Swiss-Prot record:
Detected specifically in the heart. One of its GO terms (cellular component) is mitochondrion. This is Leucine-rich repeat-containing protein 10. It is found in: Nucleus. LRR repeats lie at residues 30-51, 52-74, 76-97, 98-120, 121-143, 145-166, 167-189, 191-213. It comes from Mus musculus (Mouse). Its main location: nucleus. The keyword Repeat applies. Residues 236-274 are annotated as: Disordered.
Amino acid sequence: MGNTIRAFVAFIPTDRCQSYVVGDLREMPLDRMVDLSGSQLRRFPLHVCSFTELVKLYLSDNHLHSLPPDLAQLQNLQILALDFNNFKALPRVVCTLKQLCILYLGNNKLCDLPDELSLLQNLRTLWLESNCLTRLPDVVCELSLLKTLHAGSNALRLLPGQLRRLRELRTIWLSGNQLADFPSVLLRMPFLEVIDVDRNSIRYFPSLAHLTNLKLVIYDHNPCRNAPKVGKGVRRVGRWAEETPEPDPRKARRYALAKEENQEPPPPLLPSSS
C-alpha cells in the first residue's frame, strides 16, 4: 500500500504535488523556521516569501534550480540551506539577504560564484562541498567575517593568495580535491585552528609548527613522504600521526643536500616499529 501511495504522488503534476506537500504552510511559524527539505520541490513556494520575519529556511534535498526575486523580502534570514539541489549558478537574489550568517550550497553543480556574494558581509559559515569548482572563487576572499569554509570534494588545485585576508577564518575543509602541494597561503594564516586536506595528492608537508592556534590537521589519504610537523598539543590525523614530529637530523641534512642538487629528496627515515 505504501509503495502505491508513493507511486501515485510521484505522478501528480508539479504544482499539485507542491500544494500537497506545503499546503498547510500558510502562516508564519512561531519559531521563525521553515524546513522543506526532501519535499520533492521543483519550484520555490512563493507564499513563503510573505514570511518576512523568517530566520531559518531549509530547502535541502529538492530539485530546485532557481529561486524567485521575491525571496529578497526575507531580509531577516540568517540561515539558508540550498544543498542537494540542481543549481548550476547561485541565484543572485541570495546575495540580497544581507543578514545571512550560514549558507549551505553543497552538492549542487556550481562552477563559480557571483561577485555579488561579497555583499553578504555577515556570513560566518559557507559550505561549497561536492560542486564543480576547479578554483576557489576570489569573491570568497572578500567575506571578511567568515569563520568556517567547507570546499571539499571539488577539483581545486590551488588556493588564492588573497585567502589570507580572512583573518576570522578558523576552519577550512579541503578534502577530496586535487591539491598536489600543501597550499602555501595556509602557512601565512596563523589564526587557523582546523585544516583538513584529506584525500588529495600532496607528497610533502611543510612544517606547521608556527601556526600557533592550530588544534587539528587532517592529512590522511595523501601520497605523502612525511607527516607535518606541528606544535605541542596539536592533533594529527594521517600516516605517521603517532610518530614524533621532530625531524631526524640525518634526514634534514640529506634533504637539504638533495634540494641543493635539484634532486628528488630521498624517503624519510622513519623510526623502527620495534
